[in-house]
Amino acid sequence: MKNRHHAAKDEEAAKAYAEIIKAMNEQLEVLKEKIKEQTEKPNCKEGVKRLETIPAIGRMTAAVLFHHLTSSKFETSNKFAAFAGLSPQQKESGTSVRGKGKLTKFGNRKLRAVLFMPAMVAYRIRAFPDFIKRLEEKKKPKKVIIAALMRKLAVIAYHVHKKGGDYDPSRYKSA
C-alpha cells in the first residue's frame, strides 16, 4: 500500500491510499495490544519471558513460538523444526549425482516467516559465532546460514520451553 500511495498520480487515489494505510496501522496497533494482553496472562507470561531470553527473539516472536509449542505436542525438537518447515531435504536419485539440499516447504509457513527476522538479527549480531563461523568457512551462502539459524532458533525454543528454564548460552555455544 505504501508503494501505491507513493506512486499514485491522482490526488484522490493518494488520499484513499493514505486512509487505508492509516486504518491498517490502527488495526495493527490493536492486534499488538491484544497479543501483549494475552502474553501477560499468568498461563503465558512465564513461558513467553523464557523464550525472550533467546538471543534475537522478541515479544511477538516469543508469543508465536509459545502458541505453537503449547498448542501441539511435539516429541522432539526435530519434529518441531519439521512442523515449521525447517527440515533439510536431500535431493538424491538412484544413480544421479547428489543435488543441492534445501529446506522442505512442508509445515507452517507463518511460523517459518516469523523466525526469519530473528535469524537475520542473530546473524547480524553474531549470536552464535562458532556456528556462523563454521558455516562461513564451508563457503555457505548467507541465505543458507540464515535458514540454518532459523532452524537453530526453533530447536532452542523447543528445548527452552520443554526444560522450563531460561536460555543458557553455554549449552548452545558450539552447536
Task: Please provide the spans of the model-predicted regions.
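Phosphate-backbone recognition surface of nucleic-acid-processing proteins
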Residues: 59, 63-142, 174
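Short, amphipathic alpha-helical segments that act as regulatory/interfacial helices
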Residues: 2, 25, 116-119, 150-161
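Generic recognition of short, well-ordered alpha-helical interface segments
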Residues: 12, 16-19, 23-26, 30, ...
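Conserved phosphate/pyrophosphate-binding and hydrolysis machinery centered on Walker-type P-loop NTPases
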Residues: 10-18, 41-45, 55, 101-105, ...
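Short, well-structured alpha-helical segments
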Residues: 18, 48, 52, 59-66
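Acidic, carboxylate-rich catalytic segments that either coordinate divalent cations
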Residues: 126-175
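Long, charge-rich intrinsically disordered scaffolds of nucleic-acid metabolism proteins
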Residues: 1-50
